[in-house]
Design a protein with these regions (language model features):
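Long, distal/terminal scaffolding or interaction modules
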Residues: 1-277
């Protein structure tokens, strides 16, 4: 029988299904007192990649940017010093005490041993405001990023140049406001596209060039909202759209999003997978 409980954190009601109780009994754990949403927040709070704080470096005493809040009882070292040979984490070693719970000892050790102020690797040139990143040059507010150059406001990106305001890009250049775009060039306001060039307001394209508002196209060129055009007609229509205007961009983006809703949505994003759901 399902049971409704009140979350001790957000105070909203949530339901525990009969199958859930069976699972808790099997795992020999009590039923949750927090709702699923609050439990998810609690799990995710361990990893902070996008919030930066100004805190004192434990070695130099100077201010530095860090992914660790100032109030956290942890010592941080600037990344290059942390990687260096001037200190040794083994110096903080202690004997294990079998009379004290493991996690209490682990917590105490974690609070004593300095950690990196920001998580980064390789060269970081003019990219102080980035975290969980490596091999960046002239990057600003890029997170979970690797091999990025002349870009800003990116999350979960690899090998990207001259791109802004996007999430999950790989092997891209000159992209703006894109999500899940791979191996593409000059792609704007688009979602789930790969191997594309000069694409605007599109979704689910593969190997396409010069498309506006396309959905689920393969190997197409000079398409406007899934209608094929001649090269001359397409270029004239594109020139008449005045894409330098913010009002025009907002209008066409809304039209494209409404157009997207008319097409089936892929239930699963993945390739070369076996027995996966």
């Amino acid at each position: 029988m399902e049971e409704t409980r009140n979350c001790q954190n957000c105070k909203k009601d949530f339901t525990i299904e009969p199958d859930d109780f069976g699972f808790y009994e099997k795992m020999n754990v009590p039923a949750p007192t927090w709702c699923p949403e609050c439990r998810m927040v609690r799990r995710l709070v361990w990893r902070n990649e996008r919030n930066l704080f100004r805190r004192k470096d434990a070695h130099t005493g100077k201010d530095s940017f860090s992914g660790i809040p100032v109030e956290a009882p942890i010592q941080t070292y600037e990344t290059s010093f942390w990687y260096g040979d001037e200190w040794d984490a083994l110096d903080y070693g202690v004997d294990y005490d079998f009379s004290v719970p493991f996690f209490k000892q682990f917590q105490d050790l974690f609070h004593r041993v300095p950690i990196m102020a920001k998580s980064s690797a390789g060269f970081m040139i003019n990219s102080d405001y980035c975290n969980e990143a490596g091999r960046l040059k002239n990057a600003y507010l890029c997170f979970d990023a690797d091999f990025i150059e002349d870009s800003a406001y990116l999350v979960k990106v690899t090998n990207v140049k001259n791109s802004f305001d996007s999430h999950e890009l790989v092997d891209d250049e000159l992209c703006y406001e894109c999500v899940m775009v791979y191996k593409s060039y000059q792609t704007f306001f688009s979602l789930d596209c790969e191997n594309c060039v000069d694409v605007w307001f599109s979704k689910g394209l593969r190997g396409c060039t010069n498309c506006v508002g396309g959905v689920n196209l393969r190997g197409k060129s000079y398409d406007f909202f899934n209608e094929p055009r001649t090269k001359e007609d397409y270029e004239k229509k594109l020139a008449d759209m005045d894409l330098k205007s913010h009002a025009t961009i907002s209008r066409i983006r809304a039209e494209a999003f409404a157009f997207w809703q008319k097409f089936p949505v892929k239930y699963y994003h993945g390739i070369r997978n076996l027995n996966c759901t």
